[in-house]
């Protein structure tokens, strides 16, 4: 489809909820991949209307890199949602959408895929930790160091390759 959601081959129909994607590409020229999903733990956390809290080393790629939309605007079928989500994203690569799900962006497919997996893991850890007590903050300097250490093209490619091998082993008939 083109940015007006018109099918390029004149067949089929675009999902009108994809209308916000062109807004992100327009406002964030560094983005080459968008992944928007509603995974279980992200969806559960979004129902609580609280931001994602990064306080564990393995998910520090999202430290200070995940925005939060606290008000659900409804099904994202109009330009208003594109403006809202694109604006909320700001300089971050991810956004948690209340009562909805998540959206991650990447300069590469590998980066976006890794962030999509990590945001679900982070939400799962947050929900588990919240059920046990009060989450303790991770030291800013260490979290920033971990964020920068894991947020490299090389690590994104290596992580993506690992997940691809794992998926192919489980679903060998997909190719």
Protein language model features and the residues they cover:
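Glycine-rich flexible loops
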Residues: 1-175
């Amino acid at each position: 489809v083109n940015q007006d959601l018109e099918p390029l081959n004149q067949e089929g129909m675009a999902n009108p909820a994809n209308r916000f994607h062109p807004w992100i590409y327009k406002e964030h020229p560094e983005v080459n991949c968008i992944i928007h999903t509603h995974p279980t733990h992200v969806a559960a956390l979004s129902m609580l209307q609280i931001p994602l809290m990064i306080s564990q080393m393995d998910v520090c790629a999202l430290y200070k890199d995940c925005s939060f939309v606290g008000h659900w605007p409804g099904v994202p079928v109009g330009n208003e949602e594109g403006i809202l989500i694109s604006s909320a994203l700001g300089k971050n690569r991810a956004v948690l959408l209340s009562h909805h799900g998540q959206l991650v962006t990447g300069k590469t497919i590998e980066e976006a895929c890794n962030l999509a997996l990590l945001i679900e893991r982070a939400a799962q850890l947050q929900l588990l930790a919240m059920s046990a007590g009060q989450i303790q903050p991770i030291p800013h300097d260490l979290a920033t160091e971990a964020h920068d250490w894991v947020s490299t093209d090389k690590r994104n490619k290596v992580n993506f390759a690992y997940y691809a091998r794992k998926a192919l082993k489980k679903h060998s008939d997909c190719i």
